[in-house]
Amino acid sequence: MRIFAGIIFTACCHLLRAFTITAPKDLYVVEYGSNVTMECRFPVERELDLLALVVYWEKEDEQVIQFVAGEEDLKPQHSNFRGRASLPKDQLLKGNAALQITDVKLQDAGVYCCIISYGGADYKRITLKVNAPYRKINQRISVDPATSEHELICQAEGYPEAEVIWTNSDHQPVSGKRSVTTSRTEGMLLNVTSSLRVNATANDVFYCTFWRSQPGQNHTAELIIPELPATHPPQNRTHWVLLGSILLFLIVVSTVLLFLRKQVRMLDVEKCGVEDTSSKNRNDTQFEET
């Protein structure tokens, strides 16, 4: 803020009270990941002399934009705003030192100071708030086989913290065992997971609502208890598997028996052939002796 103090001191010394800058809005509320343009207007009587214009945008102790000698000086710019903050020159020519920030982060929230020197000096403070609605709600339903209870789970990311409210199809609060866990993402968003254990039947409807006090910031997901899968198909499959195993066993046994029977027959034939040969040899011997 040394620059700010120097400009104000210069203005006071020269008593240039006629130079006044205006801010159409002193509060901007934007969504995480969106773009924002914060306006800071100053008087331009004739054609703007860019070389005589000095503009500073600061956020607390962080340098956001520095415009001197007719161009932006990025050297002192804080790393948090590198590549995301700019001061459109076409707006400067209209007397509007508009600060544009793209892909707004949670850490961008805070109080900004617009300081302008152009024949005189003045400043304005502008507040930026960042919200991240819990729009994308992931859900899951599971059944505890031991207790037959259904566990309903809703998970979403956002900022600031939201309360998770569970209701039934009549939008009445639901009693049951609940738990909530909260963690931080890399982008500093809050990762909120809420679970509810209830006794329910198929087609029962439940709602989980990520509730915040601001209007239009509430988001709801619907969970419908699914029907239990039919038990017949698994039993039928078991029967078919068992029957197939039995048939395969019988085929293998039959094949083995046929093979063994064939081997026995071949042995019998070979045995008969040997016996016939032996008998013939004996008969030939007896004939020779005679």
From Swiss-Prot:
Sugar-modified residues: N35, N191, N199, N218, N236
Signal peptide as annotated in the record: 1-18
Induction info: Up-regulated by IFNG treatment in monocytes. Up-regulated on dendritic cells, B-cells and macrophages after activation by LPS and IFNG.
Keyword Disulfide bond: yes
Pfam families per the UniProt record, alphabetical: C2-set_2 (PF08205), V-set (PF07686)
Ranges facing Extracellular side: 19-239
Disulfide pattern: C40-C114, C154-C208
GO process annotations (BP): adaptive immune response; cell surface receptor signaling pathway; negative regulation of activated T cell proliferation; negative regulation of CD4-positive, alpha-beta T cell proliferation; negative regulation of CD8-positive, alpha-beta T cell activation; negative regulation of interleukin-10 production; negative regulation of T cell mediated immune response to tumor cell; negative regulation of T cell proliferation
Record domain Ig-like V-type: where: 19-127
GO cellular component: actin cytoskeleton; early endosome membrane; external side of plasma membrane; extracellular exosome; nucleoplasm; recycling endosome membrane
Main location: membrane
Post-translational modification: Ubiquitinated; STUB1 likely mediates polyubiquitination of PD-L1/CD274 triggering its degradation. Ubiquitinated by MARCHF8; leading to degradation. Deubiquitinated by USP22; leading to stabilization.
Effect noted on mutating E58S: No effect on PDCD1 binding
Effect of E62S: No effect on PDCD1 binding
Transmembrane portions of the chain: 240-260
Impact upon substituting S117Y: No effect on PDCD1 binding
Effect annotated for changing C113Y: No effect on PDCD1 binding
Key words, A-Z: Adaptive immunity, Cell membrane, Disulfide bond, Endosome, Glycoprotein, Immunity, Immunoglobulin domain, Membrane, Receptor, Repeat, Signal, Transmembrane, Transmembrane helix, Ubl conjugation
Membrane topology (UniProt): Single-pass type I membrane protein
Stated consequence of mutating Y56S: No effect on PDCD1 binding
Intracellular or extracellular location(s): Cell membrane; Early endosome membrane; Recycling endosome membrane
Function, in words: Plays a critical role in induction and maintenance of immune tolerance to self. As a ligand for the inhibitory receptor PDCD1/PD-1, modulates the activation threshold of T-cells and limits T-cell effector response. Through a yet unknown activating receptor, may costimulate T-cell subsets that predominantly produce interleukin-10 (IL10).
Family that this chain belongs to: Belongs to the immunoglobulin superfamily. BTN/MOG family.
Protein name stated in the entry: Programmed cell death 1 ligand 1
UniProt lineage: Eukaryota, Metazoa, Chordata, Craniata, Vertebrata
